[in-house]
């Protein structure tokens, strides 16, 4: 987003929705990370135009840049699949100054299309994911038995007998 103002964040979500709606049918047929990358490269001008049109339709005049880069991402969950924080290849759609909070999704398989209501990653997407990750990486992102605890809170709970 251009900034963290409420207006910029709201239009960012509209741009995200328009871009996802545009690219969903094309990326859903991708069989590999390299194919997804090639699709996005060939569609980059169209993706930029979709983003610009959405901005203009909503009264915004910012420019849009689209490009690939390695970017740091926080922990991200898609239903029962969780990706650890780290550096990932990203296809960026920058609006204006690009100084606001961002939205992101996994490039391949295209997990941005996961059912947000039910939070379920389809089995075919999990199979594709297993095909591009090592066994250890796949176990890391799909293991739901992991528990996160904070030592300080554990100590306080023990102290209070909770």
Task: Map each language-model feature to its residues.
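Early exported N-terminus immediately downstream of N-terminal targeting peptides
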Residues: 1-44
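A mature extracytoplasmic/lumenal domain signature
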Residues: 2, 19, 68-72, 79-82, ...
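Residues that form generic nucleotide/phosphate-binding pockets
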Residues: 26, 54, 94, 155, ...
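Amphipathic, coiled-coil-like alpha-helical scaffolding segments used for oligomerization/assembly
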Residues: 33-75
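Soluble extracytoplasmic domains of inner/organellar membrane proteins
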Residues: 81-146
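Short flanking/linker segments adjacent to small metal-binding domains or redox-active Cys/His motifs
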Residues: 141-162
């Amino acid at each position: 987003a251009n900034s963290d103002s409420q207006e910029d964040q709201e239009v960012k979500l509209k741009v995200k929705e328009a871009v996802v709606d545009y690219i969903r049918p094309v990326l859903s047929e991708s069989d590999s990370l390299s194919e997804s990358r090639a699709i996005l490269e060939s569609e980059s001008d169209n993706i930029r135009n979709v983003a610009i049109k959405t901005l203009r339709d909503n009264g915004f005049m910012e420019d849009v840049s689209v490009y690939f880069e390695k970017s740091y991402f926080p922990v991200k969950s898609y239903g029962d699949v969780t990706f650890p924080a780290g550096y990932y290849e990203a296809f960026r759609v920058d609006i204006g100054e690009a100084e606001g909070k961002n939205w992101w999704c996994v490039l391949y398989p295209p997990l941005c299309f996961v059912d947000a209501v039910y939070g379920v990653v389809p089995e075919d997407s999990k199979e594709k994911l297993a095909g591009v990750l090592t066994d250890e990486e796949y176990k890391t992102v799909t293991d739901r038995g992991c528990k996160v605890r904070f030592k300080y809170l554990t100590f306080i709970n023990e102290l209070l007998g909770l």
